[in-house]
Amino acid sequence: MPNEAPKSKILSYRRSHFVTRLPVGFLYSPSHCWLQRCNDEGLWRVGITKFASRMLGEMVDFGFELKPADPAKTGQIIGWLEGFKAISDVYCVVEGAFAGSNPALEKKIGFIDKDPYQKGWLYEATGEPDPKCMNVDDYVTVLDKTIDKILENQSADEIN
């Protein structure tokens, strides 16, 4: 099992003031997680997208409620992330078993912000991805709609 995800093709994305690079071969959840298949036995590495980390702000703490080999269901709260802007539950996006959290984050939680698609992964799980997960092109559509809604709300707040 690799310590870092292999280099993959990248899609450059820009909408309003948000710019990111999205690995093409990953799956993405509507809740702004990414999934990368690690092997043919159904091991998936999971992290949050640059968009999600930006919404939470600089990471300050995290924790997981499951131990390796514990069963995990899609949609189940398995942990939490705390950023300067917000605290968020971490939901499982793989139906199967929790394989463990990223040990590198214990020493450098900033990997979540600075290198979300390589060193900043959150956890690994074996099983099947949530059927709501999508390819990068479909995720771009989700990002567009999400950012447009944020901009719409900001405009409404400025008017009021």
How would you describe each model-predicted region?
Residues 1-77, 88, 97-160:
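Non-catalytic terminal segments and appended small domains
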